[in-house]
Amino acid sequence: MSNSSARPESLGEYLAHLPLSDEQRAELASCTSFSELHQRLAANPAASSAEAVQASVGPRLTVGSAAELEDAEMLGVDGSGRLCLKIAPPIKRTKVVPEPWRTNVLIRMWRRMTGRPNAPQPPKRELPPARWRTVGSIRRYILLALMIGQTIVAGWYMKGILPYQGWSFVDFDEIVNQPLWDTVVQVWPYALQTSILILFGILFCWVSAGFWTALMGFLELLTGRDKYKISGSSAGNEPIAPEARTALVMPICNEDVPRVFAGLRATFESVAASGNLDRFDFFVLSDTNDTDIAVAEQQAWLDVCRETKGFGRIFYRRRRRRVKRKSGNLDDFCRRWGGEYKYMVVLDADSVMSGECLSSLVRLMEANPDAGIIQTGPKASGMDTLYARMQQFATRVYGPLFTAGLHFWQLGESHYWGHNAIIRMKPFIEHCALAPLPGKGAFAGAILSHDFVEAALMRRAGWGVWIAYDLPGSYEELPPNLLDELKRDRRWCHGNLMNFRLFLVKGMHPVHRAVFLTGVMSYLSAPLWFLFLVLSTALLATNTLMEPQYFIEPYQLYPLWPQWHPEKAVALFSTTIVLLFLPKLLSVILIWAKGAVEYGGRVKVTLSMLMEMLFSMLLAPVRMIFHTRFVLAAFLGWAATWNSPQRDDDSTPWGEAVRRHGPQTLLGVAWAALVAWLNPSFLWWLAPIVGSLVLSIPVSVISSRTRLGLAAKDEKLFLIPEEYATPQELLATDQYTHENRWHALHDGFVRAVVDPRQNALACAMATARHGQAAPIEALRAERVAKAIEVGPKGLDLNTRLALLSDPVALSRLHEQVWAEHNAAWIDVWRASINNDPHSPLLPLHPENAGQPALVGA
């Protein structure tokens, strides 16, 4: 540790960044070294350099704000007597033990046959008998009959459309004895048609399921007579019992810090306004491994606690060992603090919920003691790009039909989407911890899409899973552009394919087995559709290039002509269009019936629907190609990155669009040229597909523009109720996001090393509270020496994380950087300050400076 004399200019610069009075600053300016400075700050002149810099953490942190932190009882000491902030409640551990998966039904059967019992499962309760369970089963049998019946009729029509009618004219005895090529030529058209017919049946059944779901949702919302909706079980004004404590947990990972804490603050203030704040605690559960973002999170937590007086109510925890991703993050919370709460509400990084909505969820849980999870229907809002506004419009207009329809078919055996939902803690801890999937490869290891699995385990344990589809006050945001949405879809695709391994796990309810199946089909339908189109093109090439065989039997008197029934083709095409687009029309009819003012009026909402339909038709083939790639990547074991999606409005550059969509454009051109060469008249049928692929680059770029989205908003196109009459929670979120960006902390790790107060905050919030041990001391010295040697730009991520987590090493690095006047660190810090004039930790910034007004306010 250096004890070199302090340079006057560096000592003055150091003191200038502490909010001291003129008298205090003048008194400390007489120090001859930074070691002496920290000794005097700590009021301990006998302390060594290492002890002094650590002891000065408290004074550096509390200067000018000691009363605030002391009144909130936020200051404490660790086992070694070092100052720390009480950023989380005392840990009271609860046992969280995941049950190993037994996914191989053959192994289970073999063990039973050989007299070796399978491992016992944890005890589970039986969901009490209720009328809704019988009604739900009957409804689902009806849905299955409707889907299968509709698919059989459509398949019969499709069979009549295809030119080669069945295999009856193929002589199997003859093809065995004839040359292989002759067999291929004879069988090929029939094999193609059979494959096309099978694919058509699967895809049509998938479309049929969505149609009947939307139709029943339309009827539920139109009549308003759903006697099984869970929101009807509470009057909505019952007092919440003191023991019904609820933790609001927000798992985050390398997120947009200003937006995250703006939404958290808006939600906190709304809960406070509801009068039920004493029943809720808030937890930010960080898995961030970007040290700049981690430091920004620390500062944002301190700021939001100060602004809301939320000390002791808003907590922050950053994991050092990031296992099992988001599900592991929640497991860690449940293990440390879950036993102290009766309920848990999971928020996403972009979630905002009103206090009334959260209070209603707790009341519904209290009124339904057999409910394990109650999921709200989040409303998408808050984005301004043209793409995001069209998606917001689609989810806001069409989404309620599908959500109500899901509730109609599933009732208390429903979906959980991983956020904006309330969970009963005790059964969740006992039954919903997720073990890794056994085996090796892309579909083994930590479960990626945890939400569907947790819902299935909750129901298997004997607890209901409900959707409160009509509960207002639940909000989320959507990706701003197509490419960001596709990045998210890749993760979801891999996760849903992994989940299908649980399809045959013992004890799963049939509804949740179907949920696993629909999760797979959400993405597997893309390669199936692509294969259907490819085989259809191959059949066209077969009919065009291969000489047809009109006489396939000896002594055949009449030729066998390939058949074509255009009237059946038109009828089937029309039916498919109705199934795809009638739900959208029903959504608009429902808005007409309920009132269209909040959507811009009847004319504007209808025009918006037509434009959105055209846009969705343009994007469907593009998504098909990408999802096909994602499915192939998952099966081939290509890694799916888990980067957080873009949460802010962001346009797609032309260069990135060309890189991402260029292969699709070339595919569209080549496909169109091939079909035009084979049969130009068939190109009209394929034009919506190849045309969309050819236009994918400009559509992706243009739709990502914020200017076009705002222009559409000015014309009341794609208008949603949250834009017509913005709820207070969303207004507050926008305002706080704007303010947070104004004061956003950049280059956080350099600030945590160099800045006097930022270093104090980082040391006080560091979590590696080791005692004295020679190996630990040696490792600390090695890390500090490395940081001094290579500077901030040469420091690797693991060393950064280790330094940020260790209060002793971080404080020593801070002292050594200033004592040696290390230019590699201090120059970067100065540049950061010059580029970041609104940083909240600069005392030279006038405290009464006004906040910038919200743009557009």
Swiss-Prot record:
This is Glucans biosynthesis glucosyltransferase H. GO terms for cellular component: plasma membrane. The keyword Oxidoreductase does not apply. It comes from Pseudomonas putida (strain ATCC 700007 / DSM 6899 / JCM 31910 / BCRC 17059 / LMG 24140 / F1). Involved in the biosynthesis of osmoregulated periplasmic glucans (OPGs). It comes from the Bacteria. Pathway: Glycan metabolism; osmoregulated periplasmic glucan (OPG) biosynthesis. One of its GO terms (biological process) is glucan biosynthetic process. NCBIfam families: PRK05454.1-1 (NF003955), PRK05454.2-1 (NF003958), PRK05454.2-5 (NF003962).
